[in-house]
Design a protein with these regions (language model features):
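N-terminal Sec-pathway targeting helices
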Residues: 1-16
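Aromatic- and acid-rich polysaccharide-binding/catalytic face
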Residues: 184, 217, 257-258, 267-308, ...
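Aromatic-rich peripheral "rim/lid" segments of glycoside hydrolase catalytic domains that contact
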Residues: 109-123, 132-140, 339-348, 353-356, ...
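Acidic-and-aromatic substrate-binding clefts and catalytic sites of carbohydrate-active enzymes
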Residues: 133-145, 157-170, 187-197, 220-223, ...
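Ser/Thr-rich, Proline-interspersed low-complexity disordered segments
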Residues: 19-20, 24, 32-116, 120-124, ...
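Substrate-binding cleft of extracellular glycoside hydrolase catalytic domains
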Residues: 163, 170-263, 327
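Acidic (Asp/Glu)-rich catalytic clusters
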Residues: 121-125, 145-152, 166-182, 200-209, ...
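Boundary/entry segment of secreted carbohydrate-active catalytic domains
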Residues: 104-164
């Protein structure tokens, strides 16, 4: 091969080397990659060259300049070493509880043609003296005897327990004839629904008797529930509200009875939340005012014949009004010595205490010196007649309590006076 040919080959090789150097500069190839590139280029150039060795000039690579950041480039600083974080173990989240919706109370459908009653608007017996008695467990033959006894003691009120409509049909006309106003209490347990209030009220109205209806009795006592039925406040209140609605709509007077403040308060609030506020002014309350062996003027707590005052305060506080009250059970425990600060109730005290109680309505003054309140319509203590009860005025196994009955008879006849008159 001629020198000219060799020169051309060497020139071509030099051109290849220059091109490779430019590629290195552009691509930023490292110094370790450059010899391989040169070797590849040399091999390609010498494929057609003669075997005469030709010295290859040494290419000195210049450092590749680092490109300046452009104006549009975003500078990202190298991350600083973060402080070591210790993970705090946490309890796994529990299941999310769905909020329990508050049920909307069912609303009472009440008739709108019954006016609210003032105390003086309520029906009372002729020649009312506020004296009464509790009476139960009667049959037709016994009824005549017991009503005669009530008349002998000049009782004008009675709390009467009845078992069904047949008793009402039998008893109502006889009490009407005797001039005795009755609070009627249907025999029911606290968990029993009752659907015949309207029928019972119609029987009384047809007999000319004011329909004072007591719905249920002492619901906070286990004795008023079946053994298999656990006491359930809201089950009872629902039944009571239903009964109150039915009595009201039938034209009756709605009687409530409680011996525990919380249930009574809850029931009053429930009556309002169910839309039953109209009933407030056509309802009455039946306190049970048992005095144990406390004297008539005892008013330190609810265990007194003055215990109705406690419930009057509760009604005033909760609904701003004290309804009529007819004490349906109460009086003294014959032979009682529950409170050792006071003497045992013997026959002498039994007669003195009852004479003092019934004299409230004649004198217009309670035993503790307070005025007799208009809302206290009557006091019907436990009990007119029972062969098994020591407190019974008649037929008791302990005797007939003759001194007590004589003390009551000794009080002069009178007619109860209210703040508005008789």
């Amino acid at each position: 091969m001629s020198r000219k040919t060799v020169a051309l080959a060497a020139g071509g090789c030099l051109i290849i080397l220059l091109v490779a150097a430019c590629a290195v500069a552009v691509a930023g190839l490292s110094a370790f990659e450059l010899p391989s590139l040169i070797a590849g280029a040399t091999a390609t150039a010498t494929q057609t060259a003669v075997s005469t060795p030709t010295p290859i000039p040494t290419l000195t690579s210049s450092p590749t300049p680092v490109p300046s950041p452009s104006a549009s480039a975003t500078f990202t600083p190298a991350p600083s070493p973060a402080a070591e974080t210790v993970a705090t173990p946490t309890a796994p989240p529990g299941p999310t509880k769905e909020p329990k919706p508050t049920p909307t109370p069912w609303l009472m459908q009440l008739r709108d043609d019954l006016p609210p009653l003032r105390l003086q608007d309520w029906p009372r017996p002729p020649d009312d003296n506020g004296w009464g008695i509790h009476f139960q467990y009667f049959n037709e033959g016994d009824l005549e005897v017991q009503i005669a006894r009530m008349k002998e003691l000049r009782f004008k009120w009675a709390l009467v327990v009845y078992g069904d409509e047949n008793f009402l049909r039998m008893a109502a006309p006889r009490f009407k004839e005797a001039g005795i106003v009755v609070v009627w209490r249907r025999t029911l347990q606290a968990h029993d629904p009752y659907y015949d209030w309207a029928r019972d009220i119609k029987i009384l109205q047809e007999a000319g008797m004011p329909p004072y209806m007591q719905a249920y009795n002492e619901p906070t006592l286990q004795a008023e529930w079946d053994e298999e039925q656990e006491m359930d406040e809201w089950l009872f209140i629902d039944l009571l509200l239903t009964a109150s609605r039915d009595i009201y709509n039938a034209g009756g007077y709605v009687g409530w009875q409680f011996v525990e403040d919380e249930w009574l308060t809850d029931a009053l609030h429930a009556l309002k939340s169910h839309g039953g506020e109209r009933i407030y002014r056509r309802m009455f309350f039946v306190p049970h005012a048992y005095g144990l062996n406390h004297p008539p003027d005892y008013d330190e707590d609810v265990n007194a014949v003055l215990g109705f005052l406690h419930y009057a305060d509760l009604f005033q506080r909760e609904i701003g009004y004290v309804p009529p009250m007819v004490v349906g059970e109460g009086g003294w425990k014959y032979g009682g010595d529950d409170d050792n600060r006071f003497p045992k109730v013997d026959e002498k005290l039994y007669s003195e205490y009852y004479a003092a109680l019934y004299n409230w309505f004649r004198s217009g003054v309670l035993s503790n010196g307070q005025p007799l309140p208009d809302y206290l319509f009557a006091f019907c203590p436990w009990i007119l007649s029972s062969p098994t009860d020591p407190n019974a005025f008649y037929d008791s196994f302990v005797g007939d309590h003759a001194p007590t009955k004589e003390a009551i008879k000794a009080l002069p006849p009178f007619k109860r006076k209210f703040s508005w008159g008789f």
